[in-house]
Protein backbone atom coordinates (compact mmCIF):
# COMPACT_ATOMS: atom_id res chain seq x y z
CA UNK A 1 0.00 0.00 0.00
CA UNK A 2 1.30 3.44 -0.96
CA UNK A 3 2.10 5.53 2.10
CA UNK A 4 0.33 8.84 2.66
CA UNK A 5 2.97 11.54 3.03
CA UNK A 6 1.94 14.17 5.58
CA UNK A 7 3.95 17.30 6.32
CA UNK A 8 3.06 19.27 9.44
CA UNK A 9 4.03 22.94 9.83
CA UNK A 10 3.82 24.63 13.24
CA UNK A 11 5.71 27.41 14.96
CA UNK A 12 7.80 26.39 18.01
CA UNK A 13 5.29 27.82 20.49
CA UNK A 14 3.87 25.30 22.95
CA UNK A 15 0.30 26.57 22.64
CA UNK A 16 0.37 26.04 18.88
CA UNK A 17 2.77 23.14 18.37
CA UNK A 18 1.54 20.79 21.11
CA UNK A 19 -2.17 20.66 20.16
CA UNK A 20 -1.25 19.76 16.58
CA UNK A 21 1.34 17.22 17.76
CA UNK A 22 -1.21 15.56 20.02
CA UNK A 23 -3.65 15.26 17.12
CA UNK A 24 -1.06 13.48 14.99
CA UNK A 25 0.92 11.50 17.56
CA UNK A 26 -1.36 8.40 17.41
CA UNK A 27 -0.76 8.21 13.65
CA UNK A 28 3.00 7.81 14.15
CA UNK A 29 2.45 4.11 14.88
CA UNK A 30 0.36 3.60 11.75
CA UNK A 31 2.50 2.32 8.83
CA UNK A 32 0.01 3.88 6.41
CA UNK A 33 1.41 7.34 7.15
CA UNK A 34 4.79 8.98 6.64
CA UNK A 35 4.83 12.11 8.80
CA UNK A 36 7.36 14.93 8.91
CA UNK A 37 7.18 17.94 11.22
CA UNK A 38 8.52 21.39 10.36
CA UNK A 39 9.13 23.47 13.51
CA UNK A 40 11.83 25.53 15.19
CA UNK A 41 15.11 24.00 16.42
CA UNK A 42 14.25 24.99 20.00
CA UNK A 43 11.50 22.33 19.97
CA UNK A 44 13.42 19.68 18.04
CA UNK A 45 14.40 17.56 21.05
CA UNK A 46 10.94 17.39 22.62
CA UNK A 47 9.21 16.62 19.30
CA UNK A 48 11.72 13.92 18.36
CA UNK A 49 11.24 12.36 21.79
CA UNK A 50 7.56 11.90 20.93
CA UNK A 51 8.56 10.15 17.71
CA UNK A 52 8.31 12.80 15.00
CA UNK A 53 10.80 13.20 12.18
CA UNK A 54 11.70 16.88 12.52
CA UNK A 55 12.86 19.30 9.84
CA UNK A 56 13.93 22.52 11.62
CA UNK A 57 12.72 25.87 10.32
CA UNK A 58 14.31 29.26 11.00
CA UNK A 59 17.65 27.74 11.95
CA UNK A 60 19.99 30.66 12.59
CA UNK A 61 17.03 32.96 13.26
CA UNK A 62 15.96 31.80 16.73
CA UNK A 63 16.65 35.18 18.36
CA UNK A 64 14.65 37.04 15.71
CA UNK A 65 11.76 34.62 16.14
CA UNK A 66 11.76 34.88 19.94
CA UNK A 67 11.81 38.67 19.70
CA UNK A 68 8.86 38.71 17.30
CA UNK A 69 6.86 36.11 19.24
CA UNK A 70 7.42 37.35 22.79
CA UNK A 71 6.27 40.93 23.23
CA UNK A 72 7.52 42.94 26.21
CA UNK A 73 4.06 44.19 27.19
CA UNK A 74 0.40 43.67 26.42
CA UNK A 75 -0.26 44.10 22.71
CA UNK A 76 -2.13 47.14 21.42
CA UNK A 77 -3.13 48.00 17.86
CA UNK A 78 0.23 49.57 16.96
CA UNK A 79 2.38 46.95 18.70
CA UNK A 80 0.32 44.13 17.14
CA UNK A 81 0.92 45.62 13.69
CA UNK A 82 4.64 45.92 14.39
CA UNK A 83 4.72 42.31 15.56
CA UNK A 84 3.04 41.13 12.36
CA UNK A 85 5.33 43.28 10.23
CA UNK A 86 8.42 41.87 11.95
CA UNK A 87 7.04 38.36 11.49
CA UNK A 88 6.63 38.74 7.72
CA UNK A 89 10.36 38.48 7.05
CA UNK A 90 10.41 35.24 9.02
CA UNK A 91 7.29 34.01 7.23
CA UNK A 92 9.04 34.53 3.90
CA UNK A 93 12.11 32.61 5.10
CA UNK A 94 9.94 29.65 6.07
CA UNK A 95 8.10 29.89 2.75
CA UNK A 96 11.38 29.72 0.85
CA UNK A 97 12.37 26.59 2.77
CA UNK A 98 8.98 24.94 2.20
CA UNK A 99 9.03 25.69 -1.53
CA UNK A 100 12.47 24.14 -1.86
CA UNK A 101 11.57 21.09 0.24
CA UNK A 102 8.16 20.51 -1.35
CA UNK A 103 9.55 20.91 -4.86
CA UNK A 104 11.85 17.97 -4.15
CA UNK A 105 9.67 16.00 -1.72
CA UNK A 106 6.05 16.98 -2.20
CA UNK A 107 3.65 15.72 0.50
CA UNK A 108 0.22 14.34 -0.26
CA UNK A 109 -1.26 16.66 2.32
CA UNK A 110 -0.09 19.46 4.62
CA UNK A 111 -1.36 20.14 8.12
CA UNK A 112 -0.72 23.70 9.26
CA UNK A 113 -1.15 25.52 12.56
CA UNK A 114 -3.46 28.50 12.12
CA UNK A 115 -0.83 31.21 12.75
CA UNK A 116 1.92 29.49 10.76
CA UNK A 117 0.98 31.34 7.60
CA UNK A 118 3.79 30.04 5.40
CA UNK A 119 2.45 26.49 5.35
CA UNK A 120 -0.97 27.39 4.01
CA UNK A 121 0.23 30.05 1.59
CA UNK A 122 2.80 27.74 -0.01
CA UNK A 123 0.50 24.70 -0.02
CA UNK A 124 -2.16 26.71 -1.82
CA UNK A 125 0.37 27.99 -4.37
CA UNK A 126 1.65 24.48 -5.06
CA UNK A 127 -1.77 22.81 -5.21
CA UNK A 128 -1.23 20.69 -2.09
CA UNK A 129 -4.39 19.88 -0.09
CA UNK A 130 -4.05 21.34 3.40
CA UNK A 131 -5.77 21.34 6.74
CA UNK A 132 -5.71 24.17 9.29
CA UNK A 133 -5.47 23.21 12.95
CA UNK A 134 -6.96 25.98 15.07
CA UNK A 135 -5.79 25.90 18.69
CA UNK A 136 -7.69 29.13 19.36
CA UNK A 137 -11.05 27.77 18.29
CA UNK A 138 -12.70 31.15 17.80
CA UNK A 139 -9.90 33.04 15.98
CA UNK A 140 -11.66 32.69 12.63
CA UNK A 141 -14.21 35.31 11.60
CA UNK A 142 -17.81 34.10 11.71
CA UNK A 143 -21.12 35.55 10.63
CA UNK A 144 -22.66 35.80 14.10
CA UNK A 145 -21.96 35.54 17.81
CA UNK A 146 -19.45 37.23 20.09
CA UNK A 147 -16.39 38.53 18.18
CA UNK A 148 -12.97 37.89 19.69
CA UNK A 149 -9.98 40.08 20.58
CA UNK A 150 -12.15 42.89 21.98
CA UNK A 151 -11.41 42.32 25.65
CA UNK A 152 -13.72 39.35 26.12
CA UNK A 153 -17.20 39.97 24.73
CA UNK A 154 -19.73 37.58 26.18
CA UNK A 155 -23.27 36.64 25.21
CA UNK A 156 -25.10 39.92 24.46
CA UNK A 157 -27.70 40.77 27.09
CA UNK A 158 -29.45 43.67 25.36
CA UNK A 159 -29.82 45.40 22.00
CA UNK A 160 -26.91 47.76 22.72
CA UNK A 161 -24.54 44.84 23.22
CA UNK A 162 -25.87 43.22 20.04
CA UNK A 163 -25.02 46.45 18.19
CA UNK A 164 -21.59 46.60 19.84
CA UNK A 165 -20.79 43.12 18.63
CA UNK A 166 -22.05 43.84 15.13
CA UNK A 167 -19.77 46.89 14.97
CA UNK A 168 -16.86 44.88 16.39
CA UNK A 169 -17.21 42.34 13.58
CA UNK A 170 -17.17 45.18 11.04
CA UNK A 171 -14.11 46.75 12.71
CA UNK A 172 -12.32 43.40 12.57
CA UNK A 173 -13.09 43.10 8.86
CA UNK A 174 -11.96 46.66 8.12
CA UNK A 175 -8.84 46.40 10.29
CA UNK A 176 -7.65 43.30 8.47
CA UNK A 177 -8.18 44.99 5.11
CA UNK A 178 -6.14 48.00 6.21
CA UNK A 179 -3.27 45.83 7.47
CA UNK A 180 -3.30 43.79 4.26
CA UNK A 181 -3.13 47.00 2.22
CA UNK A 182 -0.22 48.34 4.28
CA UNK A 183 1.69 45.09 3.81
CA UNK A 184 0.64 44.54 0.19
CA UNK A 185 4.14 44.81 -1.30
CA UNK A 186 5.55 42.19 1.06
CA UNK A 187 2.61 39.87 0.41
CA UNK A 188 2.70 40.22 -3.38
CA UNK A 189 4.74 37.05 -3.88
CA UNK A 190 1.74 35.03 -2.66
CA UNK A 191 -0.84 36.79 -4.89
CA UNK A 192 -2.55 37.27 -1.56
CA UNK A 193 -6.23 38.07 -1.22
CA UNK A 194 -7.57 38.40 2.30
CA UNK A 195 -11.01 36.92 1.57
CA UNK A 196 -12.18 34.28 -0.89
CA UNK A 197 -15.18 34.62 -3.20
CA UNK A 198 -17.21 33.02 -0.41
CA UNK A 199 -16.12 35.81 1.95
CA UNK A 200 -13.95 33.46 4.02
CA UNK A 201 -10.42 34.21 5.23
CA UNK A 202 -7.80 32.71 2.93
CA UNK A 203 -5.18 32.35 5.67
CA UNK A 204 -7.16 29.28 6.77
CA UNK A 205 -7.71 26.19 4.66
CA UNK A 206 -10.65 26.32 2.25
CA UNK A 207 -10.88 22.52 2.53
CA UNK A 208 -10.77 21.63 6.23
CA UNK A 209 -10.35 23.50 9.52
CA UNK A 210 -10.05 21.52 12.75
CA UNK A 211 -11.16 23.50 15.78
CA UNK A 212 -9.14 22.21 18.73
CA UNK A 213 -11.69 22.89 21.42
CA UNK A 214 -15.26 22.26 22.49
CA UNK A 215 -18.39 23.47 20.77
CA UNK A 216 -20.14 23.33 24.15
CA UNK A 217 -18.32 26.43 25.44
CA UNK A 218 -18.28 28.44 22.21
CA UNK A 219 -20.11 31.78 21.94
CA UNK A 220 -19.53 32.37 18.24
CA UNK A 221 -21.93 31.13 15.57
CA UNK A 222 -21.85 30.87 11.80
CA UNK A 223 -18.65 28.86 11.34
CA UNK A 224 -17.79 27.68 7.79
CA UNK A 225 -19.20 24.29 6.79
CA UNK A 226 -15.70 22.79 6.58
CA UNK A 227 -14.96 23.76 10.21
CA UNK A 228 -14.93 20.61 12.36
CA UNK A 229 -14.81 20.40 16.16
CA UNK A 230 -12.23 17.85 17.29
CA UNK A 231 -12.20 18.52 21.02
CA UNK A 232 -9.29 19.62 23.22
CA UNK A 233 -5.82 18.20 22.56
CA UNK A 234 -3.43 20.77 24.01
CA UNK A 235 -1.75 18.64 26.67
CA UNK A 236 1.97 19.05 27.35
CA UNK A 237 4.30 16.53 25.72
CA UNK A 238 7.38 16.77 27.93
CA UNK A 239 8.51 13.72 29.91
CA UNK A 240 7.23 14.08 33.47
CA UNK A 241 10.34 12.43 34.93
CA UNK A 242 12.32 15.50 33.82
CA UNK A 243 10.21 17.67 36.14
CA UNK A 244 10.06 15.84 39.48
CA UNK A 245 7.86 17.49 42.10
CA UNK A 246 6.58 15.37 44.97
CA UNK A 247 3.16 16.70 45.97
CA UNK A 248 2.56 13.98 48.55
CA UNK A 249 4.43 16.02 51.16
CA UNK A 250 1.56 18.54 51.21
CA UNK A 251 -1.30 16.30 52.39
CA UNK A 252 -3.13 18.80 54.61
CA UNK A 253 -3.26 21.79 52.29
CA UNK A 254 -5.30 22.63 49.24
CA UNK A 255 -2.92 22.60 46.28
CA UNK A 256 -3.15 25.48 43.81
CA UNK A 257 -1.27 25.64 40.50
CA UNK A 258 -0.45 29.19 39.37
CA UNK A 259 0.69 29.77 35.78
CA UNK A 260 0.74 32.23 32.90
CA UNK A 261 2.08 29.78 30.36
CA UNK A 262 5.34 29.69 28.44
CA UNK A 263 5.15 33.20 26.95
CA UNK A 264 4.18 36.48 28.66
CA UNK A 265 7.60 37.00 30.25
CA UNK A 266 6.53 40.55 31.09
CA UNK A 267 3.70 39.25 33.29
CA UNK A 268 5.51 36.74 35.48
CA UNK A 269 6.76 39.09 38.19
CA UNK A 270 3.22 40.35 38.81
CA UNK A 271 1.90 36.78 38.83
CA UNK A 272 4.41 35.85 41.53
CA UNK A 273 3.48 38.94 43.55
CA UNK A 274 -0.23 38.08 43.38
CA UNK A 275 0.53 34.49 44.40
CA UNK A 276 2.47 35.74 47.44
CA UNK A 277 -0.50 37.90 48.48
CA UNK A 278 -2.83 34.91 48.22
CA UNK A 279 -0.39 32.71 50.13
CA UNK A 280 -0.33 35.20 53.01
CA UNK A 281 -4.12 35.26 53.16
CA UNK A 282 -4.59 31.49 52.82
CA UNK A 283 -2.14 29.49 54.95
CA UNK A 284 -4.35 26.42 54.40
CA UNK A 285 -3.40 26.42 50.69
CA UNK A 286 -0.06 25.70 49.05
CA UNK A 287 0.62 27.63 45.85
CA UNK A 288 2.86 26.24 43.10
CA UNK A 289 3.94 28.96 40.69
CA UNK A 290 5.41 27.71 37.43
CA UNK A 291 7.60 30.03 35.37
CA UNK A 292 6.88 28.08 32.19
CA UNK A 293 10.52 27.50 31.26
CA UNK A 294 10.73 23.98 29.85
CA UNK A 295 13.65 22.19 28.26
CA UNK A 296 16.03 23.11 31.08
CA UNK A 297 17.06 21.39 34.34
CA UNK A 298 14.15 21.39 36.79
CA UNK A 299 14.31 23.87 39.65
CA UNK A 300 12.09 24.28 42.71
CA UNK A 301 12.44 27.09 45.23
CA UNK A 302 10.33 27.51 48.37
CA UNK A 303 9.78 31.25 48.80
CA UNK A 304 7.29 30.91 51.65
CA UNK A 305 6.08 28.09 53.85
CA UNK A 306 3.12 27.64 51.50
CA UNK A 307 4.51 28.95 48.20
CA UNK A 308 6.89 27.17 45.83
CA UNK A 309 8.26 28.42 42.52
CA UNK A 310 9.16 25.81 39.91
CA UNK A 311 10.75 26.23 36.51
CA UNK A 312 8.17 24.13 34.65
CA UNK A 313 5.42 21.57 35.22
CA UNK A 314 3.78 19.45 32.49
CA UNK A 315 0.07 20.17 32.85
CA UNK A 316 -1.13 16.69 31.97
CA UNK A 317 0.62 15.05 34.91
CA UNK A 318 0.31 17.75 37.56
CA UNK A 319 -3.12 19.32 37.10
CA UNK A 320 -4.87 16.09 38.22
CA UNK A 321 -2.99 16.41 41.52
CA UNK A 322 -4.15 19.99 42.13
CA UNK A 323 -7.32 21.23 43.79
CA UNK A 324 -7.52 24.56 41.97
CA UNK A 325 -5.75 26.34 39.12
CA UNK A 326 -5.03 30.03 38.67
CA UNK A 327 -4.11 30.69 35.05
CA UNK A 328 -3.89 33.25 32.26
CA UNK A 329 -6.61 31.94 30.00
CA UNK A 330 -4.48 30.12 27.43
CA UNK A 331 -6.30 27.51 25.37
CA UNK A 332 -4.22 24.58 26.62
CA UNK A 333 -4.59 25.20 30.35
CA UNK A 334 -8.24 26.23 29.89
CA UNK A 335 -9.12 22.81 28.52
CA UNK A 336 -6.81 20.83 30.78
CA UNK A 337 -8.80 22.22 33.71
CA UNK A 338 -12.02 21.00 32.09
CA UNK A 339 -10.59 17.58 31.19
CA UNK A 340 -9.47 16.98 34.79
CA UNK A 341 -12.42 18.74 36.43
CA UNK A 342 -10.42 21.47 38.19
CA UNK A 343 -12.11 24.81 39.04
CA UNK A 344 -10.11 27.79 37.85
CA UNK A 345 -9.50 31.46 38.47
CA UNK A 346 -8.57 33.11 35.17
CA UNK A 347 -6.41 36.26 35.08
CA UNK A 348 -6.36 37.15 31.37
CA UNK A 349 -3.31 39.03 30.11
CA UNK A 350 -3.24 39.25 26.31
CA UNK A 351 -4.18 37.73 22.95
CA UNK A 352 -7.23 35.42 23.13
CA UNK A 353 -7.13 35.07 26.91
CA UNK A 354 -9.93 37.54 27.68
CA UNK A 355 -12.16 35.54 25.33
CA UNK A 356 -11.35 32.26 27.07
CA UNK A 357 -11.99 33.94 30.42
CA UNK A 358 -15.51 35.00 29.47
CA UNK A 359 -16.21 31.54 28.06
CA UNK A 360 -15.05 29.97 31.31
CA UNK A 361 -17.24 32.25 33.39
CA UNK A 362 -20.33 31.78 31.20
CA UNK A 363 -19.80 28.01 31.16
CA UNK A 364 -19.71 27.97 34.97
CA UNK A 365 -16.24 26.42 35.20
CA UNK A 366 -14.19 29.43 36.30
CA UNK A 367 -14.08 32.84 37.93
CA UNK A 368 -12.15 35.75 36.46
CA UNK A 369 -10.39 38.85 37.79
CA UNK A 370 -8.12 41.64 36.60
CA UNK A 371 -4.54 40.41 36.60
CA UNK A 372 -3.09 43.38 38.52
CA UNK A 373 -5.84 43.94 41.10
CA UNK A 374 -4.92 42.16 44.32
CA UNK A 375 -8.31 43.02 45.80
CA UNK A 376 -10.26 41.58 42.85
CA UNK A 377 -8.04 38.49 42.74
CA UNK A 378 -8.46 37.95 46.47
CA UNK A 379 -12.24 38.23 46.27
CA UNK A 380 -12.45 35.91 43.26
CA UNK A 381 -10.24 33.34 44.97
CA UNK A 382 -12.51 33.45 48.04
CA UNK A 383 -15.47 32.73 45.75
CA UNK A 384 -13.54 29.89 44.14
CA UNK A 385 -12.90 28.26 47.51
CA UNK A 386 -16.44 28.85 48.74
CA UNK A 387 -18.15 27.16 45.80
CA UNK A 388 -18.58 23.52 46.74
CA UNK A 389 -20.44 22.11 43.75
CA UNK A 390 -19.41 22.46 40.11
CA UNK A 391 -22.09 20.62 38.09
CA UNK A 392 -21.31 22.50 34.86
CA UNK A 393 -17.65 21.53 35.17
CA UNK A 394 -18.55 17.86 35.58
CA UNK A 395 -20.88 18.01 32.57
CA UNK A 396 -18.15 19.54 30.40
CA UNK A 397 -15.56 17.10 31.75
CA UNK A 398 -17.71 14.24 30.48
CA UNK A 399 -18.37 16.02 27.18
CA UNK A 400 -14.63 16.43 26.62
CA UNK A 401 -14.25 12.64 26.68
CA UNK A 402 -16.79 12.24 23.87
CA UNK A 403 -14.52 13.76 21.22
CA UNK A 404 -12.30 11.59 19.03
CA UNK A 405 -9.74 14.05 17.60
CA UNK A 406 -7.46 11.70 15.71
CA UNK A 407 -10.38 9.82 14.14
CA UNK A 408 -11.76 13.12 12.86
CA UNK A 409 -8.32 14.06 11.53
CA UNK A 410 -8.03 10.76 9.65
CA UNK A 411 -11.48 11.19 8.11
CA UNK A 412 -10.54 14.66 6.90
CA UNK A 413 -7.21 13.48 5.49
CA UNK A 414 -8.89 10.76 3.44
CA UNK A 415 -11.74 13.07 2.38
CA UNK A 416 -9.32 15.66 1.02
CA UNK A 417 -7.23 13.06 -0.78
CA UNK A 418 -10.35 11.53 -2.34
CA UNK A 419 -11.46 14.99 -3.49
CA UNK A 420 -8.01 15.52 -5.00
CA UNK A 421 -8.30 12.25 -6.93
CA UNK A 422 -11.70 13.24 -8.31
CA UNK A 423 -10.20 16.43 -9.73
CA UNK A 424 -7.70 14.50 -11.88
Model feature map: region roles:
Residues 1-56:
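N-terminal subdomain of nucleotide-sugar transferases
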Residues 24, 110-112, 312-358:
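A donor-sugar binding/catalytic signature common to diverse glycosyltransferases
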Residues 37-81, 162:
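Conserved nucleotide-sugar phosphate-binding/catalytic loop shared by glycosyltransferases and other
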Residues 88-163, 216:
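Conserved nucleotide-sugar donor-interacting segment of glycosyltransferase catalytic cores
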Residues 213-324:
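Donor-nucleotide binding loops and adjacent catalytic segments primarily
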Residues 376-424:
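C-terminal amphipathic helix plus adjacent low-complexity
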Amino acid sequence: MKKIKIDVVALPLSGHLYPTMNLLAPLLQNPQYEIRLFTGPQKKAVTEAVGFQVLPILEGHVKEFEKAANNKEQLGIISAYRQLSASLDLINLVSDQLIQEWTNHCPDIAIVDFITLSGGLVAEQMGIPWITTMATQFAIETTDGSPCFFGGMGTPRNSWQVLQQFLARKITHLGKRIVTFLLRDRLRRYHFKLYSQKGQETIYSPYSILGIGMKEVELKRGFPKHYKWVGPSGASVEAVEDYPLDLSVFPNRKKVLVTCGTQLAWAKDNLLYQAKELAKAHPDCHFFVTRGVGGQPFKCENLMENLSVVSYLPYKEYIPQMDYVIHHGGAGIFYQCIIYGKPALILPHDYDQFDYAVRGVEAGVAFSAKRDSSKAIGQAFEELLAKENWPELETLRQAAQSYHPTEMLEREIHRLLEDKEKEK
